[in-house]
Amino acid sequence: LWYRRQRQMCIRDRDDGELCIKGKHVAKGYYKAEEETKAAFDNDGWLHTGDLAEIDENGFAKIIGRKKEIIITSGGKNIAPVELENLIKTHELIGQICMVGDGKKFLSALIVLDGDGGAEKWANENGVDYNIETMSKNEKVLSAIQDHVDQSNSKVANVQQIKKFTLLSNEWTDSSGELTPSLKLKRHVVAERYENEIEAMYEEAK
């Protein structure tokens, strides 16, 4: 447990990594919403933001994910996937990624190609016919993504690394249901819709 007082604000990093804040600038609760207030504030007046954060020695908080997005491995490790997902999405080939691994020995990921120009640009520059479906099986594409995953893995702890990935042959959009209208990932939808693809990655490892 760690916290820092800064001006009229205290920020605290709980044992589970959740960012909590307290101070004169923080509301005392939700107007005429007792249950919501109880859910958001503890008995000591700390607002539980639901954000996962790392707090440095100077008291600056870096948001690394959302508590509800935590993956808990079979070894009991709590993993916030967003940091590594964001690293991997920097490659122009990649449009979306969803890390998985709840109750599993290691982390895997489902990846979809970028349909907004990035994958097409890469294909043109690398002598590959641009087609999302055929590119998902192209060895040159898979090798490029594997290299990028390896590079991204090197920037996080071993327990946070992606050991396997599956490149899907479709795009994720708000209309197809995997993304919200604001283009946020619907993890529960992905987990349900691609259950077979997810399980296949772990079957291969047995």
PLM-predicted stretches and their roles:
Residues 1-13:
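Single conserved hydrophobic/aromatic residue that forms the stacking wall/gate
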Residues 5-8, 33-36, 115:
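Active-site loops of AMP-binding adenylate-forming
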Residues 11-13, 17-73, 90:
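Conserved ATP-binding/catalytic segment of the ANL
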Residues 26, 60-89, 119-139, 158-162, ...:
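Adenylate-forming
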Residues 52, 57, 90-116:
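C-terminal boundary motif of the adenylate-forming
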Residues 96, 148-206:
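Conserved C-terminal "lid"/linker of ANL adenylate-forming enzymes
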Residues 102-126, 154-169:
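Conserved loop-to-beta-strand segment in the C-terminal subdomain of adenylate-forming
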